[in-house]
Amino acid sequence: MQAIIDAEQSFKFPVLVGDIGGTNARFSILVDSNAEPKEFPVLQTADYATIDEAIQHAILDQTAIQPRSVILAVAGPVDGDEIDLTNCDWVVRPKKMIADLGFEDVTVLNDFEAQALAVVSLEGHHMEQIGGKPEEAVATRVVLGPGTGLGVAGLFRTRHAWVPVPGEGGHIDIGPRTERDYQIFPHIERIEGRVTGEQILSGRGLRNLYLGICAADKITPTLETPVDITSAGLDGSNPQAAETLDLFATYLGRLAGDLALIFMAHGGVYLSGGIPVRILSALKAGSFRATFEDKAPHKAIMRDIPVRVITYQLAALTGLSAFARTPSRFEVSTEGRRWRMRR
């Protein structure tokens, strides 16, 4: 008789690692602990009804390699045997994956837990720094990622290992501070009466902010998508779009600074996700760093804390791969998040 159990031990190769976001899913396979990852094309989650179907058709059917272990990073909290994804209709069912796809071992982490693992695994040329001093080697770090949603995680060092701290920080309250903020915020869409970080600092948040600016200025919106708004803001062809990017950078700087204070992140704040890379020039323009540092009475501390934009699209896979290769380098709790077939 076969039974599925939790297990705390190293991973059996080959290992399939996957980063499952609200819009895109990325996968690679590690044949062994020393091999370079075998990468696969980025998938659109909307193109497949289930994650099992996506893995079968886009991964397993395209290679002769049969993974024994799987490590997935998913957008949303990991709780129970059926894991719903935030901003995506997929449901991860590890027991079903083991039964149907031939895996022996499935581990599911939070997507920004994987991003946290990545910040101490990426090479320097995969990041671009915005202000601050060089990071302190073993100091606490924070990862903040506006994309389809808004992800947040911390990373701290014990005596022997790095410990990622996942959470749902994208759903904290965010509020007005300046006179202009007070003009715009009444027009921002609320969730049960709240304006959350994700309602502004995400793809849809970018559009919410643009519509709020247009409403405050009594101007009919002419741009439909976050991509349109970003393009028009970067080239300066639309004043409201340009202000959208400036305020997006401002609010992102405020939140990043708050998180840096909470964690006292002398190891740096790391911006991941698709949006920071696309608007890098806007983040460098000044308002982001200025509001990041504007944290009296601790402005001197904030001036020293570096911010780095992760420019590598496969950062989460890098973090998961590092965990698969050298799990002893990290302290990752897999209780209730790892399923294994015992034969």
Swiss-Prot record:
<dbReference type="GO" id="GO:0005536">
    <property type="term" value="F:D-glucose binding"/>
</dbReference>
<dbReference type="GO" id="GO:0005524">
    <property type="term" value="F:ATP binding"/>
</dbReference>
<keyword id="KW-0067">ATP-binding</keyword>
<keyword id="KW-0547">Nucleotide-binding</keyword>
<dbReference type="GO" id="GO:0005829">
    <property type="term" value="C:cytosol"/>
</dbReference>
<protein>
    <recommendedName>
        <fullName>Glucokinase</fullName>
        <ecNumber>2.7.1.2</ecNumber>
    </recommendedName>
</protein>
<dbReference type="InterPro" id="IPR003836">
    <property type="entry name" value="Glucokinase"/>
</dbReference>
<comment type="similarity">
    <text>Belongs to the bacterial glucokinase family.</text>
</comment>
<dbReference type="Pfam" id="PF02685">
    <property type="entry name" value="Glucokinase"/>
</dbReference>
<keyword id="KW-0324">Glycolysis</keyword>
<keyword id="KW-0808">Transferase</keyword>
<dbReference type="GO" id="GO:0006096">
    <property type="term" value="P:glycolytic process"/>
</dbReference>
<dbReference type="InterPro" id="IPR050201">
    <property type="entry name" value="Bacterial_glucokinase"/>
</dbReference>
<keyword id="KW-0963">Cytoplasm</keyword>
<feature type="binding site">
    <location>
        <begin position="18"/>
        <end position="23"/>
    </location>
    <ligand>
        <name>ATP</name>
    </ligand>
</feature>
<dbReference type="GO" id="GO:0004340">
    <property type="term" value="F:glucokinase activity"/>
</dbReference>
<dbReference type="InterPro" id="IPR043129">
    <property type="entry name" value="ATPase_NBD"/>
</dbReference>
<keyword id="KW-0418">Kinase</keyword>
